[in-house]
Swiss-Prot record:
Disruption phenotype: Mutants are resistant to aldicarb, an inhibitor of acetylcholinesterase.
Protein's organism: Caenorhabditis elegans
Name listed for the protein in its UniProt record: Resistance to inhibitors of cholinesterase protein 19
Alphabetical keyword list: Cytoplasm, Cytoplasmic vesicle, Membrane, Neurotransmitter transport, Transport
Chief localization: cytoplasm
Amino acid sequence: MAAQFYERNTSGMNADRFMTRLTDESTVNTMQRHYWTARQFIRTKLGKKEDEHLEASDNELDTCLNLYRSVHGTSFQLLNNVDNYANFLLDETLVQNVLGKYLKEKGKIDKTEAVGRILIAVGRSLLFSSHRLNAARIGVSTFYNKLSVFVERAIGDCSQTIEAVQMCRTEYRGSLLWMKKTSEELDPEVDGSMEKFREAQTTVKSNKERLDRLKTDTLQKVDLLSASRSNLLSYVLTHYQNELYEYYSKTSRAFETLAENINCYNNYDFEILSHLATGTKPERERKSEKEESAKTSQPRGNEEELKNLLFGRESPQFGEEEVQDESRSQCDSPLIEDVDDERRKTGDLLDLESAASIAFPIGPLATLFDTSSFVPPILPPPKPNAVSDDILSLFDGNKANSSGKEASATTMDWQSLIDGFDRENEDNLL
């Protein structure tokens, strides 16, 4: 069985715990023991290296202490996170409840019958979601209470044992230093040297016995602490997981029923705020196919109860009205009209007005060119022999007159042709 506890036959108070030690030891031995304990404590704080054999004997205890520190730190972190999560769930529940009541009140006073029913339905769905979320929040609160009790009692009790075993190990190592010092100064011929060594040896033995008992208690308590926390988490989180799954399943079915009932109403197209259009909706055929595939993958239950809960007697007949197929896409907001359609309409109107203002002639088209008109031939280029290299030939009057007559005749032929072409074009245009 487990070893006796280190506070056996005592009331647990500090004065009663050390009463036997005060009566058995002398004042000098007590002062020496405290001196070597303080010296060992200072060595530990300064990071002095201990004997490797002494450290190897405490490997199991060090592993147990590391496990305790991990359980202690993670438990406090988990407690803080669960507290924050419970507060966030409470805020979300209150927001959904207030928003649901607000939508119900506005739906009752709305002048449009369809919009009023939709607002009432959405408000009821939000109230239903807030009630289910509040039920899931109760599980989180229960988890927080049980975890706080575990941290306060189990970890608090184990921390006392950890502190005791660490203090006892410091005293034991300090007594070893004391015995090492007395053994180096041991001289059988000197009076009182053997008594000092026996006192140090007795202190080492008593500290070793206490340390062994505390090691056993520490190992058992830390193992039990880790196992108890695992059992607590598995038990509480299983209930929370079931409540969370029930919340999501019921709220999802409620919102699916709400969407089905809202789709029965006709959409309203407004001609304002068209400049805010940012995108288009998917086609109704694709949307209906996706909804049907999602419906077939998840079975439904108690749809009539959810309809009655959300809509009451104001629920429209779902399934009787079929939505007409629309080839064109609609904008995301019901208050926004498609910008492309509006531009196309305005462009068509402008084209019609400009076309109506132009008077087109009725009858056969007029001819633009007369194929029977005379086209003068192009004169061949001058021969190289016609040009004389002699400068005196330029002053020849006969040749100059003949070339001038030919150039003037060619110019007159081209001028008459251009004038005749301009007259024909003017007649056709008139």
